[in-house]
């Protein structure tokens, strides 16, 4: 480095507060971690000093231990009895709990898990308080968990540096010119322990501090202020790490616990990292880290430093090779953004001993779940609310769910949640024998941002110059459907609104002659701009009207409604081809599954249909009275119309590969078929936050297997259930909800970000033995699986509920690989034998796979024709 010059340029300084800050060479990031957070919350609540040994209790186990108790060799997951033997003066505080039938959580003494549910609200509330304090000092914060977060400090530090060194405010004309020499700063001890090179020749020129050290200095100062502020306001201590990226800052935040902070300088990165193991690095832990160690033959980062990038790519593949090389060299360009807003909430409880045996017992628990969801719902940031409430019931032989929509004008109170779920429970009771219940849950789904400027369908019904008026008794948020009359309706027809609620009927609409729904929509679409006239405008391609951007969505909805309304009106003009009304089978979209056709509709189709249903009502029938009075001229000339109807029917084709039935003359159908066809043959696109449990190879394909269960993140569970839903449609199977249910584990084979294989495993205890040799000796030619009660056996562990492979990847060993991984990974630390596996209602092809798989595990022995099945 040239004497008096920095190795950083003016461009590097300017880059600190622009998009892509994570790539700036002057980047600084902090990681803050609360010290024994749950224990601290209870100590503050009870007014105890931090020096008093304290552990947080849940039932008879410990879930958090403060540092004073750790000094007595007490650890988490010990029982209360064991812990008090080690430290008689140990103070234990049980977490807050809800009692069945109560709507308020309390600190109960010795609660029974059969009648109580844990409440973690106090810790969530304190976590929110801590984050709010941090955001006052630095706004870019990402919550990593309930007790830790990452802070992007680069732009905040740049602002301070420019204030401290005003000469940096006047940049050089050439941004590539080096910055002036950085000042020498004295680090006070309160800023934390600074990790530097162990052996430093301070006479060397390259030891001179540069601007990256200055940025670290002021970042450490901000973090110290944050930690002091948290303690001043809440009395909580926390530890912190400050360095150049999230991985390094998290790595050093635990170096100097509790209640201290650690700074890792750039010249010390190598010395610090080579002393660690690969699995110590963020994102390289768990099973993924173990796979890397096995492939590289070492667990030392020091050895990785001696490996080239090409060597790692050859060993680990194009994706994982560079990832491991960068992380082991201290490079992490992960962007820190605000946390992704949650889309769902779940409150659930397992009843392992005391089952729920009646509706009254279930409603008592609904009161608890409702209070839990209500309190968490109120904590949501912004104007957000769920669209759907869902009830899930699990019994010994049954898992069923029911859901209902939450009206936008309803207050989501505890009473509303209880009443809504009670209604759903009664629906399930009428259809199934749901008792005794072993798992019960209520969830909010489809949580969305509420647009304050949004309006309902009544917003389209503006007054016109034809004396259209509405009764003031109609609420702006009224539910129900509007039955509109078209231009062929009589003048004396009335306009009515209906609702399930007690709403007075509106007065009749006075209309001018010849005015129908299209006229009303047209008035809305081309209405004169008011206060938005000064806004930017765009020209509509459909009608060439200039529309303000603020009204664009409304205008596009108008065209959707108008086009579909015309189409529906035209369809109503086509008379039947026979005197007797013929029931025409509606066109369906999707793959043929049994006697039904199914595939998800496109977003555009769903939007059109939802809008039209809400707008038109009565099944989209625009002309109920007109159909009763069809003019003779139309009814008598039906030949051409009938021929047109037959032509449309003949254009329906069925794809030979994906079995989807669609209309070959409809652009919309062709697009739907294209999407569905690629999905069926190529697999479902999916990605997970967690690491895979198995990697087939580390080449370009990056084939791997993921395991998703109730302990996985909610996002991953949802993605796995979406893939399972697709598989259920493929196999014509009943839907199964796996989110939050302990007994299910989903194994997914992912290739190039597509799920091309899926296996759903569940815990079982018994199954029926099936002997194919006996069936063959009896000359049975049926594909059915026959079971006998006397063949029921216990001792089974793993049940295979679903197993599926995409058509394009069959006969490549994927199903066997999924099954083998299920044997190894379904129960942690235990490898299940083939004799402990049973299959749920296999088809003929499923039987052939089972027999083949058993034979391969028994070296081709004929005894392998014995297998087990169970009733799911």
Swiss-Prot record:
Gene3D superfamilies: 3.30.70.270, 3.40.1170.60, 5' to 3' exonuclease, C-terminal subdomain, DNA polymerase, Y-family, little finger domain. One of its GO terms (cellular component) is nuclear replication fork. Zn(2+) binds at residues 540, 543, 555, 559. It is an enzyme of class 2 (transferase). Residues 569-602 are annotated as: Disordered. Keywords: Acyltransferase, Cell cycle, DNA damage, DNA repair, Metal-binding, Nucleus, Transferase, Zinc, Zinc-finger. It is found in: Nucleus. InterPro entries: AcTrfase_ESCO_Znf_dom, DNA/RNA_pol_sf, DNA_pol_Y-fam_lit_finger_sf, DNA_polymerase_eta, ESCO_Acetyltransf_dom, Rev_trsase/Diguanyl_cyclase, UBZ3, UmuC. Transmembrane segments: none annotated. Interacts with pds5. The keyword DNA repair applies. It comes from the Eukaryota. GO terms for molecular function: damaged DNA binding; DNA-directed DNA polymerase activity; protein-lysine-acetyltransferase activity; zinc ion binding. Signal peptide: none annotated. A zinc finger (UBZ3-type) spans 533-567. It comes from Schizosaccharomyces pombe (strain 972 / ATCC 24843). Its EC number is 2.3.1.-. GO terms for biological process: error-free translesion synthesis; error-prone translesion synthesis; meiotic sister chromatid cohesion; mitotic sister chromatid cohesion; response to radiation; translesion synthesis. Residues 583-595 have a biased composition (Basic residues). Residues 29-285 form the UmuC domain. This is N-acetyltransferase eso1. Coiled coil: none annotated.
């Amino acid at each position: 480095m040239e004497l008096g010059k920095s190795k950083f340029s003016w461009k590097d300084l300017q880059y600190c507060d622009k998009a892509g800050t994570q790539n700036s060479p002057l980047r600084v990031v902090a990681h803050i971690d609360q010290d024994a957070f749950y224990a601290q919350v209870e100590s503050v609540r009870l007014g105890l000093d931090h020096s008093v040994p304290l552990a947080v209790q849940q039932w008879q186990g410990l879930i958090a231990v403060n540092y004073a108790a750790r000094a007595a060799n007490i650890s988490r997951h010990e029982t209360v009895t064991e812990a008090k033997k080690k430290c008689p003066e140990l103070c234990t505080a049980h977490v807050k709990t809800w009692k069945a039938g109560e709507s308020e959580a309390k600190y109960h003494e010795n609660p029974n898990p059969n009648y109580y549910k844990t409440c973690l609200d106090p810790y969530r509330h304190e976590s929110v308080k801590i984050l709010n304090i941090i955001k006052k000092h630095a706004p870019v914060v990402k919550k990593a968990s309930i007790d830790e977060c990452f802070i992007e400090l680069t732009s905040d530090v740049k602002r301070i540096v420019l204030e401290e060194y005003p000469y940096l405010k006047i940049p050089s004309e050439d941004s590539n010119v080096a910055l002036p020499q950085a000042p020498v700063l004295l680090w006070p001890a309160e800023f934390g322990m600074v990790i530097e090179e162990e052996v430093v020749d301070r006479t060397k020129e390259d030891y001179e501090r540069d601007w990256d050290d200055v940025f670290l200095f002021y970042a450490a100062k901000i973090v110290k202020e944050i930690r002091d502020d948290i303690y001043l306001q809440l009395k909580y201590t926390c530890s912190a790490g400050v360095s150049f990226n999230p991985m390094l800052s998290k790595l050093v935040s635990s170096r100097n616990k509790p209640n201290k902070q650690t700074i890792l300088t750039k010249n010390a990165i190598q010395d610090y990292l080579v002393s660690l193991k690969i699995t110590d690095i963020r994102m390289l832990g768990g099973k993924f880290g173990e796979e890397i160690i096995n492939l590289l033959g070492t667990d030392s980062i020091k050895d990785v430093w001696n490996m080239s990038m090409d060597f790692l790519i050859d060993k680990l593949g194009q994706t994982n090779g560079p990832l491991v090389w960068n992380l082991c060299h201290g490079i992490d360009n992960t962007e820190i953004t605000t946390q992704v807003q949650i889309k769902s909430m779940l409150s659930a409880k397992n009843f392992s001993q005391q089952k729920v045996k009646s509706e009254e017992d279930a409603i008592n628990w609904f009161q608890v779940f409702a209070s839990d969801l209500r309190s968490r719902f109120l904590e949501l940031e912004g104007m957000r609310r769920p669209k759907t409430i869902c009830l899930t019931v699990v019994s010994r032989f049954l898992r069923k769910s029911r859901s209902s929509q939450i009206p936008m004008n309803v207050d989501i109170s505890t009473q509303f949640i209880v009443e809504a779920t009670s209604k759903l429970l009664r629906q399930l009771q009428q259809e199934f024998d749901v008792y005794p219940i072993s798992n019960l849950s209520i969830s909010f789904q489809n949580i969305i941002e509420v647009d304050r400027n949004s309006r309902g369908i009544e917003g389209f019904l503006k007054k016109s110059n034809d004396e259209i008026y509405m009764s003031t008794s109609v609420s702006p948020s009224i539910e129900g459907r509007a039955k509109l009359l078209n231009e062929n309706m009589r003048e004396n027809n009335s306009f009515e609104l209906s609702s399930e609620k007690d709403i007075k009927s509106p007065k009749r609409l006075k209309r001018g002659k010849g005015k129908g729904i299209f006229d009303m929509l047209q008035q809305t679409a081309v209405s004169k701009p008011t206060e938005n006239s000064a806004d930017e405008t765009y020209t509509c391609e459909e009608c060439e009207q200039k529309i303000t951007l603020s009204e664009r969505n409304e205008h596009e909805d108008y065209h959707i409604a108008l086009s579909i309304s015309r189409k529906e009106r035209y369809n109503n003009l086509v008379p039947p081809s026979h005197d007797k009304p013929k029931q025409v089978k509606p066109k369906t979209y999707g793959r043929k599954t049994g006697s039904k056709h199914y595939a998800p509709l496109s977003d555009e189709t769903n939007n059109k249909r939802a809008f039209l249903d809400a707008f038109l009502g009565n099944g989209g029938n625009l002309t109920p009275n007109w159909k009763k009075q069809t003019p003779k001229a139309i009814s008598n000339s039906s030949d051409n119309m009938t021929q047109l109807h037959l032509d449309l029917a003949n254009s329906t084709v069925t794809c030979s590969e994906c079995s989807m039935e669609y209309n070959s003359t409809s652009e919309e159908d062709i697009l739907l078929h294209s999407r569905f066809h690629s999905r069926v043959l190529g697999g479902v696109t999916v990605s997970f936050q967690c690491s895979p449990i198995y990697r087939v190879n580390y080449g370009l394909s990056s084939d791997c297997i993921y395991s998703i269960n109730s302990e996985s993140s909610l996002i991953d569970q949802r993605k796995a259930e979406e893939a399972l839903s697709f598989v259920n449609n493929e196999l014509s199977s009943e839907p199964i909800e796996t989110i939050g249910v302990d007994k299910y584990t989903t194994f997914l084979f992912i290739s190039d970000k597509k799920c091309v294989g899926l296996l759903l495993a569940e815990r079982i205890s018994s199954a029926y033995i099936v002997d194919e040799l006996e069936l063959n000796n009896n000359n049975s030619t049926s594909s059915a699986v026959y079971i006998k009660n006397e063949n029921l056996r216990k001792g089974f562990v793993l049940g295979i509920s679903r197993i599926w492979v995409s058509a394009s990847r069959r006969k490549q060993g994927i199903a066997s690989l999924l099954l083998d991984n299920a044997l190894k990974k379904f129960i942690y630390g235990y490898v299940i034998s083939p004799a402990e596996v049973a299959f749920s209602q296999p088809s003929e092809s499923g039987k052939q796979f089972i027999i083949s798989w058993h034979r391969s595990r028994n070296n081709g022995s004929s005894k392998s024709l014995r297998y087990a099945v169970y009733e799911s």
